[in-house]
């Protein structure tokens, strides 16, 4: 740890790379909203802001029961201030992500030291899946910040204000993802108290029961909304049946139902899913993370007294999500602040010249080179005739080489070099993705392109859509987007011509049913969330593209 405090230049390097980490995340603000989930959530919040109805959630022009309300409230509030646009959608999520970074720093500083806090913040800012989630915005940035804030106040704040602030953050987190997230927090604190012989004292502390009671009180807005939209109206058709309870779904079906695969939304679980997912999701720090967790497991088996809250929360999340039958890579984002702190604390204990630091320095150098080479490879695949991305990559790579080979002249020690060079390589990759890569591929989000055409040429005219739907069309269109079925559309077309956005297959079906169809325009389409190497190659891309059509439909 002395390596980080002894250099007078360390703080300057830290500030520069922390600013770079923030910047590359902010660069995602100018990108379009990704389909399907991001654009779906943006559209739900759009309807909330436009209608002034902050109680009911709707998608596809029908009642929607899946995620809780908190992210939609924050997004709708942002729309009310900044207008309905992609930046306004992403801004509140970025605020909560930044809050997660702030609490990562504060938590590490309180539990360990200032150098550990600085390294933890750099790891947090440059962890791959956090950067991806700030571009493909869903609920995770909100949850990450709220989760870290709740744990900080319950672990470190003194007095009753810590209990109620932590309860407020935890309640907001529950109203973002569900009651299930309370389990790893409780498990983490129980482990800490048990190992340190404080279990009886903690369980008889009225503050903890006060905090849990306040958490239950603070989630009442969510329960009231669910009751008003669903429990009060058992006649509503949800998940193909009536009598669906929103409150039951919130407490059981959306959480334990997914875990046990008994709810309306099902998946296929793999107990090793997150073991290999973290290898790429926590890049470029994943190897160091696994090493730090192995060290914590050894200490756990020895029952060493000390700080165990973060380890307990992290391991319980890992085990719970691994046992679940419904799994997605971004589920682990919520413990990335704690992963960052554990990794930083373990890393700062390595000493200059010892074999493990030498080995991990070589590992991180290899990972950094792979990241830089990956950027150049993407440029060669996609931009071989455009040299602006290459100039950016060469300049950043030159800086990385200079830092690695001339570190002593910059007052940078071995551990500092490992941390700074890894962070710089990660920032290079993320800058390339947000400046060049995402804007290029998002041109093939056909719904957004169709909405742009409609806003310019047929402004204010409602457009119908039949499956497959486009959530980006719904969000970016200034006019209403009406979801319907083919039979209903033909009935409407008998009265007046209608605008329709749809696929080639649906267009052919309409023609087979003797409808009069005029093609107004067509738009190249590719599901951006399911990238394949062939799509990235310009000469192979046409064979991967589908097309969506703007049609005027009349009944003959």
Predicted regions and their residues:
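Short hydrophobic alpha-helices at membrane interfaces in multi-pass membrane enzymes
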Residues: 120-121, 156-171, 312-314
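Transmembrane-lumen/periplasm boundary regions of multi-pass, lipid-linked membrane glycan transferases
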Residues: 44, 157, 181-304, 309-346, ...
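Membrane-interface alpha helices of multi-pass inner-membrane proteins
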Residues: 132, 163-177, 318-322
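Specific aromatic-rich, kink-prone transmembrane helix
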Residues: 103, 142-158, 339-342
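Short acidic/glycine- and proline-prone juxtamembrane loop motifs at membrane-interface regions
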Residues: 129-142
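Transmembrane-helix motifs of polytopic, lipid-linked glycan transferases
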Residues: 91-111
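Membrane-embedded architecture of ER/inner-membrane glycosylation machinery
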Residues: 2-5, 14, 160, 164, ...
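Membrane-interface transmembrane helices that cradle and orient dolichyl/undecaprenyl
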Residues: 109-111, 150-163, 173, 347-350
């Amino acid at each position: 740890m002395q390596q980080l405090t002894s250099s007078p230049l360390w703080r300057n390097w830290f500030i520069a790379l922390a600013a770079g980490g923030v910047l590359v995340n902010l660069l995602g603000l100018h990108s379009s909203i990704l389909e399907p989930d991001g654009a779906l959530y943006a559209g739900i919040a759009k309807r909330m802001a436009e209608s002034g109805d902050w109680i009911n959630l709707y998608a596809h022009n029908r009642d929607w029961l899946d995620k809780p309300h908190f992210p939609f409230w924050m997004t709708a509030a942002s729309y009310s201030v900044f207008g309905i646009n992609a930046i306004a959608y992403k801004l509140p999520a970025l605020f909560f992500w930044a809050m997660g970074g702030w609490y990562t720093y504060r938590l590490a500083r309180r539990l360990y030291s200032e150098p550990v806090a600085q390294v933890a913040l750099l790891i947090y800012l440059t962890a791959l899946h956090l950067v991806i989630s700030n571009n493909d915005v869903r609920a995770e940035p909100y949850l990450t910040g709220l989760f870290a804030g709740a744990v900080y106040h319950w672990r470190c704040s003194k007095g009753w204000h810590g209990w109620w602030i932590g309860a407020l953050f935890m309640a907001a987190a529950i109203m973002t993802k569900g009651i299930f997230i309370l389990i790893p927090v409780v498990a983490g604190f129980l482990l800490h108290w048990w190992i340190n012989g404080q279990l009886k004292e903690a369980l008889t502390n009225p503050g903890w029961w006060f905090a849990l009671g306040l958490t239950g009180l603070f989630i009442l807005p969510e329960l009231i909304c669910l009751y008003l939209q669903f429990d009060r109206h058992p006649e509503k058709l949800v998940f193909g049946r009536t009598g669906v309870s929103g409150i039951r779904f919130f407490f059981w079906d959306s959480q334990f139902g997914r875990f046990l695969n008994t709810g309306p939304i099902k998946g296929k679980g793999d107990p090793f899913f997150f073991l290999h997912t973290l290898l790429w999701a926590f890049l470029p720090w994943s190897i160091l993370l696994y090493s730090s967790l192995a060290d914590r497991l050894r200490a756990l088996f020895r029952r060493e007294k000390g700080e165990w809250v973060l380890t307990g929360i992290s391991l319980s999340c890992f085990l719970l999500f691994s046992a679940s039958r419904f799994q997605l890579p971004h589920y682990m984002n919520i413990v990335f602040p704690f992963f960052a702190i554990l990794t930083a604390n373990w890393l700062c204990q390595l000493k200059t010249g010892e074999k493990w630091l030498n080995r991990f320095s070589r590992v991180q150098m290899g990972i950094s080179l792979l990241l830089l080479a990956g950027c150049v490879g993407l440029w060669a695949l996609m931009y071989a005739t455009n040299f602006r991305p290459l100039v950016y990559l060469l300049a950043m790579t030159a800086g990385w080489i200079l830092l690695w080979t001339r570190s002593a002249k910059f007052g940078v020690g071995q551990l500092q070099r490992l941390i700074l060079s890894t962070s710089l390589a990660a920032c290079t990759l993320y800058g390339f993705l947000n400046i060049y890569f995402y804007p290029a591929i998002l041109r093939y989000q056909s719904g957004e392109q169709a909405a742009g055409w409609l806003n310019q040429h047929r402004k204010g005219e409602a457009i119908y859509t039949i499956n497959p739907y486009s959530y980006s069309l719904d969000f970016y269109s200034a006019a209403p987007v009406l979801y319907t079925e083919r039979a209903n559309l033909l009935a409407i077309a008998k009265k007046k011509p209608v605008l329709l956005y749809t696929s080639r297959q649906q267009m052919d079906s309409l023609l087979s049913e003797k409808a009069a169809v005029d093609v107004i325009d067509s738009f190249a389409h590719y599901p951006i969330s399911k990238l394949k190497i062939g799509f990235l190659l310009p000469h192979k891309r046409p064979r991967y593209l589908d097309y969506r059509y703007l049609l005027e439909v009349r009944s003959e």
